[in-house]
Regions:
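Alpha-helical solenoid repeat scaffolds, predominantly canonical TPR units
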Residues: 10, 44-47, 51, 93, ...
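Alpha-helical linker/edge segments of TPR/alpha-solenoid repeat scaffolds
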Residues: 78-86, 90, 121-142
Length: 142
């Protein structure tokens, strides 16, 4: 687990060495591995969530780097956004989960963002929270 802690402490230096393209995939693998080990190591889930936060923090720069490297390809799935939205939804933090999904969709990351947002909006309605329109047409609700 030491390598992951060092990555979090030195993320600015790592970003300079790897670039946002490389850093995106370092955090993706960190999320994947730590989440896989969550039942084995007591701090694995916290480390996975910390990696999600870092990957989301650099999402815009990573998207630019990926689009520059592969201009003809759509952006891939973003583990940080996906896992963060899932964790927030599980914790019933629906407003924050909806915001994360919206950011991921706006940035163009692949994923089932529209479906996730509909599911979260339904849960908000069931809890009695108003779902307000974002557009003047009223067609897009949050």
């Amino acid at each position: 687990m030491g390598i992951f802690r060092r990555i979090f402490r030195q993320h600015d230096q790592t970003a300079g060495d790897l670039g946002y393209f490389g850093l995106h995939f370092v955090y993706q693998e960190t999320i994947r591995l730590q989440y896989k080990w969550r039942q084995t190591f007591p701090d694995a889930l916290d480390l996975a969530f910390a990696a999600c936060h870092k990957q989301v923090q650099y999402a815009t720069q990573a998207a630019e780097a990926l689009q520059e490297a592969f201009p003809e390809q759509p952006l891939p799935a973003h583990f940080g956004f996906q896992r963060t939205a899932s964790v927030l939804e599980q914790r019933k933090a629906y407003e924050q989960a909806l915001e994360i999904c919206q950011r991921a969709k706006e940035q163009g990351w692949a994923g089932n963002w529209a479906w996730r947002m509909l599911r979260i909006k339904k849960k908000l309605r069931e809890r009695g929270y108003p779902v307000v329109s974002m557009s003047s047409s009223g067609m897009s609700q949050i």
